Amino acid sequence: MVKSFNLKAIRFAVRVGNIVAPELTARATFKLFCTPPRARRLSQKEAAMTQRAEQRLASARAMDLAYRKGPYFDDAGRDQTRDAPRDETLRYYVFEPEAVSADTQTVVLLHGWTGKSAFMLGFIGPLLAKNFRVLAVDLPAHGASSARQLHLPKAANALSELHQQTGPWHSIIAHSFGGAVGCVLVSGFIPSFAKVPLKRLVLIATPHSMQWIFHGFGRAVGLNQRSQTLFDGLVRPLAGRPLGAFESKNMLRDADVPTLLMHAPDDKEVPYSGAELMAGGQRCVTLLPMPGLGHRRILYAAKTIRAATAFVCDADLEHSPVAG
């Protein structure tokens, strides 16, 4: 997130702000944190795959969902989202199998930070071949969806409304930040959002802790302890819970949904140790190491797509706890 900005200038401003205006500094840092770069440089392989994916998107039914901004919680913890305007739009693409029937179920694809739905389209063909309907979503502030900022509660809010319009859903397949969104949805972890019932959840290179992400960002831009505490505290009014509560392991435990974690031990962006923590001792969670695939290559690997499809399709798959 920080690489796309002038980090040296940001660190200088934060160093001054820590002293003279810590609250303003925390709010400005939060806005920066929640603002995805408009585009990142794609590798040659990513660019070629994205071009093919964009062509495939043209064959889908493109839909826009108008949703309310939020959530917003007052000082007493009451959700005020119902009073927010419905002036944001979420773009999603609907792919239908050839033989739609009463038994056709829906799988939702969620991309990661700075991604878009086109990055997830490697899963489309195999899922359609198994007679699933597929929804490929552009998260807020990404792809063709509106908004300029995105955080976990905002994503959960938009996806909860999408579920109300298009559910029930059979499964979610999600990468990185999208996996964190999936954890929130399936657990109903944010107050006022009901659990999204699923039969399967596939998480690819998903972070285990929002606090770990916040503190890493704070160190990168130079927040001192007071400003970091204020920065962390901005989560509760948006999420109805403190930052430290957002641990994926706890959300997966509360969800109790069969879950497949795929993570590369060589991932340099989201550490593999987090996946081990998420899976450790969990009855319904299976960890599948994917060595050599890093944080982004894992998304396009044939074995990742095969494993995700098999997991979603296997109604009789048994899950055993994976030790951390």
Describe the predicted segments one by one.
Residues 44-98:
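N-terminal cap/lid segment of alpha/beta-hydrolase-fold proteins
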Residues 117, 124-146:
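Conserved alpha/beta-hydrolase
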Residues 149-170:
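Alpha/beta-hydrolase active-site loop
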Residues 173-174, 178-182:
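Gly/Ala-rich beta-loop-alpha elbow adjacent to hydrolase catalytic centers
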Residues 191-241:
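Hydrolase active-site cap/lid region
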Residues 254-256, 261-263, 267:
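Short beta-strand/loop motif that positions the catalytic acidic residue
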Residues 268-274:
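Conserved alpha/beta-hydrolase "acid-adjacent" motif
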Residues 293-305:
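Catalytic histidine-centered segment of alpha/beta-hydrolase-like enzymes
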